[in-house]
Amino acid sequence: IVFYSVVTAFMVSHNIFNVYMIPYAMLPIIIRVFLDSRTAFLTHVITILICSISLRFPHEFILTQLAAGLVAIFSLRELSQRSQLFRTALLVILTYAAIYFAFELMTENGLANDFSKLNARMYTYFFINGILLLFTYPLLFLLEKTFGFTSNVTLVELSNINSDLLRQMSETVPGTFQHSMQVANL
């Protein structure tokens, strides 16, 4: 929470890039993988509310980030395959784009007749945000190794019967291998 608050305040005070480039949905994904959805949602809401203090348009930021965080949490029920993170990043990008487009339609100088007023740079920021969101997977690995956590992805990788150790075990001691696989599936 502190990291996102400091980065947001720094970017706003020094007018560096745009805060929509920061992957705020990374925090609820990490917390969702190791803990649960409620904790991830509460942490995300607290982070977004704290970060919105330093912004010019906090209501737009809060609604956009809240929607993206909810999509990230609920599209990632259990991280058991790497492809799920790609799908989540794509859904977050689409959520950002849809919410921002809706805000653009609601403004006074709306896009009712002229889509050339659309700020294409914002959609680039959303895409960069999605790319940065893909760095969640290596960060999860780093957190697992650093703090000794175990995620579902690690358990799936450990139960891969094509690994050298399990293949050797199935050839030399098939009974122990079968028993180990049954216990692992429990």
Where are these regions (language model features)?
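Generic detector of multi-pass transmembrane helix bundles and their immediately adjacent loops
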Residues: 2-177, 181
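An active-site-proximal "capping" alpha-helix that borders the catalytic cofactor pocket
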Residues: 182-186
